[in-house]
Amino acid sequence: LVPSPDYPLWTACVNLAGGTAVHYLCDEQSEWYPDIDDIRSKITSNTKAIVIINPNNPTGALYPKEVLQQIVDIAREHQLIIFSDEIYDRLVMDGLQHISIASMAPDLFCVTFSGLSKSHMIAGYRIGWMILSGNKRIAKDYIEGLNMLANMRMCSNVPAQSVVQTALGGHQSVNDYIVPGGRVHDQRDLVYDMLNQI
């Protein structure tokens, strides 16, 4: 299950891996939150996983704990793997707080994706990671495949790796960007105002 609208790479990844991407609705009339009834209606015996993008790209929606809990409940009921794209987790504004869905589902196998590309304004560096948590026993083949891919890589982005510790520790300059007067905050407000004038 993949959100709609989604970041197109998710649909491509599912299809390239031999799956069939089935899209669930994120409803504009409900602050772009996932439509829980639509998710339930799309689950079949072939459904293996659910993708969430939180904060969402392209809508910008940040899912509250109540919505995340409903997704966890569905995943638990149907034994779904959760793939959670959280690359924008540090770009949360207006006093809101990002909650990682993996923290709410220690019994479920979750793959959480993040990185520095968005939060630290270094998209060209291509430095990111995935965290595997929960019940890894159900994903032995998946983990074996990840290890194989990792071992086949000839080299990593060494310059980007050298900035990870500094970027994640100490002063978080991203915090200066997301408050009033900060570049990201003010650009967001400008784009929002301009789009609403159309």
For each feature predicted by the language model, list its residue ranges.
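Structural detector of well-ordered beta-strand residues that form the stable sheet scaffold
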Residues: 1, 22, 83, 111-113, ...
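Conserved PLP-anchoring active-site segment centered on the Schiff-base-forming lysine
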Residues: 1-14
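Short strand-turn motif at the edge of the Rossmann-like AdoMet-binding core
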Residues: 5, 86-88, 115-116
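Helix C-cap/helix->beta junction micro-motif
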Residues: 17, 77-78, 108
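Active-site phosphate-binding strand-loop segment of PLP-dependent enzymes
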Residues: 22, 27-97
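Short, intrinsically disordered, charge-balanced linker/junction segments flanking boundaries
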Residues: 42-44, 69-70, 148, 190-198
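Conserved core segment of the aminotransferase class I/II
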Residues: 106-185, 189-195
